[in-house]
């Protein structure tokens, strides 16, 4: 079969300014997958930065062996779909990523997939309807409430109505604005003010009083619709749901144990500053309850593929913060739970053989990967483990067997030599560095995230963290190191 994996980008992107480097590279990972499924043709069709699919150096795409690489150039979904159709695909898999300021690439990829399906191509992609619900945070809030999922109480503020008198001179009294402030006064403070269409926590503000909310809504910061939510205190987490659509039209979701996220000084998880630890399958967090609820969520929204969920454990109950039907910054860590690489999981989705609970086929594939690549990164990312141990991990929902722990921590910019030196450590699984030459603020310049672990106790994970600090004292950032130590200590 001819398999096409695609993603798009609606933003201007200059590869001479923004540099992304991963170890192992996507070129290596996709070459390995294509080699192990050599009876199929692989096409990677993307727009830069082509996250999860392609590597690039300045403007040149680094092509993978045994893989056809195509740079998409269309603007509309119709144009992009035509480019993909020209590749004559049997299957097309969306590998959507995220951008700022609008988290709508999943929606664009869904429209492309819808056109492909209409033209007879089998796709693995979330529907346009699902993406539309999750793109707009107010629509998400309504969906969660209507379907009895726990989430924060919230008030939606329509920008045009809030300032209705500016465009309608006959308006003497803005009734809508009075209504909005009355509704906000009923919320428990503090509250979070967020854009209804922004990505993750970008632009969010924690506000502690009603006068402060008034000041915000009367400021230039308020320039589009906002969602004002109660701030739910508690530990923040994230996880992924991998969902297969069956031949009978039913859906089989697999919810992975959650990763714990650190928060910034405002109590918000920041993508550029967070430390992630997990997966955590602990009784005290009622992960069985979480799994059941998220399986229900996946079936109602009819997920197909990978979706990421942000959560908070508030007053001994799970609450949903955000739903992202796309790949995420946690996708590499989640793949490791399956002892796979992300490209391998996407390939199995394309071939219709992906089963998050399977053991026999997965073990066979993993062993082939490691046997044929014993001197490269596969030794780390696809560790060969006994069938009994693998089965115990996959069936942990019943046996409560502990999953191997991983930590995702961020470093300042590293040289390529430093990145490769870190990767020589046997427990370091993955590095990804983003560097923006045009940025002026420190946090905007980018960072290098390191994923390490694969051990079954927090003590062992802490020892790995200490080894990194000892061997690379010049690059580790103390604030992230201390946060990671505290998070690991919370499990001891």
Language model feature labels by segment:
Residues 67-76, 155-156, 172-175, 205-208:
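Short acidic-hydrophobic, aromatic-tinged amphipathic segments that line or gate anion-handling sites
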Residues 1-123, 163-166, 368, 372, ...:
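ATP-binding N-terminal substructure of ATP-dependent carboxylate-amine bond-forming enzymes
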Residues 347-371, 378-379, 383-492:
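Peripheral (often C-terminal) accessory segments that flank ATP-dependent C-N-forming ligase machineries
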Residues 298-332, 387, 392-400, 410-412:
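Conserved metal-phosphate-binding beta-hairpin within the catalytic cores
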Residues 151, 173-175, 186, 190-193, ...:
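Conserved ATP-binding module of the ATP-grasp superfamily
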Residues 113, 117-203:
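A conserved helix-loop-beta module that forms one wall/lid of the active-site cleft
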Residues 153-165, 190-216, 236-238, 263-282, ...:
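Glycine-rich phosphate-binding loop of ATP-grasp-fold ATP-dependent ligases
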Residues 229-301, 324-350:
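ATP-dependent carboxylate/phosphate-activation module, predominantly the ATP-grasp catalytic core
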